[in-house]
Amino acid sequence: MDLVVFLALTLSCLILLSLWRQSSGRGKLPPGPTPLPIIGNFLQIDVKNISQSFTNFSKAYGPVFTLYLGSKPTVILHGYEAVKEALIDRGEEFAGRGSFPMAEKIIKGFGVVFSNGNRWKEMRRFTLMTLRNLGMGKRNIEDRVQEEAQCLVEELRKTKGSPCDPTFILSCAPCNVICSIIFQNRFDYKDKEFLILMDKINENVKILSSPWLQVCNSFPSLIDYCPGSHHKIVKNFNYLKSYLLEKIKEHKESLDVTNPRDFIDYYLIKQKQVNHIEQSEFSLENLASTINDLFGAGTETTSTTLRYALLLLLKYPDVTAKVQEEIDRVVGRHRSPCMQDRSHMPYTDAMIHEVQRFIDLLPTSLPHAVTCDIKFRKYLIPKGTTVITSLSSVLHDSKEFPNPEMFDPGHFLNGNGNFKKSDYFMPFSTGKRICAGEGLARMELFLILTTILQNFKLKSLVHPKEIDITPVMNGFASLPPPYQLCFIPL
């Protein structure tokens, strides 16, 4: 009996403590629904369609509101004005990376995506500079993407026009582009080492994006004590880390500081230059984690966008016909598309932008955090508070994009048929934490899609009206439903 009383008292104290901690901060933070003890507002959120839940809350509490995902407050920014004010106008104050316990457990704050403070600044600066040195925005990386696009075309020809699921083959191309930047060499699509590498990367991205991981991130104690797919992430990451450290070792043995070949070489040279500095951020641990970030952010997201783009082109054959007419007129059939062509292909450029806007791949992006105590609008947000931005609310803003739920390249064309930029276009997020590989991803999407459409007619297995383009929401990303198509050589 004494044990029962003790447990009851303990539980009551925990609940009262939770209620006190939540109520003590609510006078300063933006408004929001009343949280339950311990679990917060978790039961009020649809983990498979978080962005819709945010839209519903914004109607009740305005564009800046607070949710408790577990016992900690999270500030939500909904709509273009709130997102712009935070991430662009006050970018430095919102440049922290918000809480992501599962990533913190396996990556331990290394790399560029989940790091903070000086480490993040150093790794991001180095990554951007190295991508430029390797030819980002120049011919060097463009040549690699063009080569990969042609290899992809050859693989698609092997299907001989028969029905196929494009998931695997569209994953190979972006992964190989990253491999060529990191290791200097690409792999054959059937190479065993390449297949294992791709499988581990893709599996980790899928698990990290799953609803179960959103639960684990809200209740970190589950990570160590509950069975589940999250344990597979640790095993996969350890495999990838071991693989990358072996590659780094090979690079060390053949390094020529006067002639860097790839990302690893540039990092090792930088490491030599700063090895006299105490607490230098350029450790092998940081290198392995940064490479892992480049693979994770640069393969699955691009391949999913490509896969969704082909589905939309099947659904809207009139759009496909206009794009292919533009390719025939500007590029022809006797050379590969190049980035210089894009400025002469406004409809194709608009189509690719519309794909990214429409699919809304990462509805809430990765969490931010405020780097100091700040006053935002009329609210006080304490240092370290996690901030989530609803990119969906920006990309699907009906004032900027009339009929936002419709796929229409006209959203990015003016009355003269010329390409029209939009400040609301932020599929890569915006501000200080905008995706470091944005330029590479845009290049891949343009060159790979135009090369495919230059060489093939896309044939659906069903009538376009029967094609389902409804996204499969998995909690973090919007994925296309499974489908098959035929690539008919032109």
From Swiss-Prot:
Keywords: Acetylation, Endoplasmic reticulum, Heme, Iron, Lipid metabolism, Membrane, Metal-binding, Microsome, Monooxygenase, Oxidoreductase, Signal. Heme binds at C435. GO terms for molecular function: arachidonate 14,15-epoxygenase activity; heme binding; iron ion binding; oxidoreductase activity, acting on paired donors, with incorporation or reduction of molecular oxygen, reduced flavin or flavoprotein as one donor, and incorporation of one atom of oxygen. The modification N6-acetyllysine is found at K249, K252, K375. It catalyses: an organic molecule + reduced [NADPH--hemoprotein reductase] + O2 = an alcohol + oxidized [NADPH--hemoprotein reductase] + H2O + H(+); (5Z,8Z,11Z,14Z)-eicosatetraenoate + reduced [NADPH--hemoprotein reductase] + O2 = 14,15-epoxy-(5Z,8Z,11Z)-eicosatrienoate + oxidized [NADPH--hemoprotein reductase] + H2O + H(+). Its EC number is 1.14.14.1. Residues 1-25 form the signal peptide. Pathway: Lipid metabolism; arachidonate metabolism. The keyword Lipid metabolism applies. Pfam families: p450 (PF00067). GO terms for biological process: arachidonate metabolic process. Its main location: endoplasmic reticulum. Its cofactor is heme. The keyword Ligase does not apply. GO terms for cellular component: endoplasmic reticulum membrane. Expressed in liver as well as in extrahepatic tissues including brain, kidney, lung, heart, and intestine. It is a peripheral membrane protein. It is an enzyme of class 1 (oxidoreductase). It is found in: Endoplasmic reticulum membrane; Microsome membrane. Belongs to the cytochrome P450 family. A cytochrome P450 monooxygenase that selectively catalyzes the epoxidation of 14,15 double bond of (5Z,8Z,11Z,14Z)-eicosatetraenoic acid (arachidonate) forming 14,15-epoxyeicosatrienoic acid (14,15-EET) regioisomer. Mechanistically, uses molecular oxygen inserting one oxygen atom into a substrate, and reducing the second into a water molecule, with two electrons provided by NADPH via cytochrome P450 reductase (CPR; NADPH--hemoprotein reductase). This is Cytochrome P450 2C29. It comes from Mus musculus.
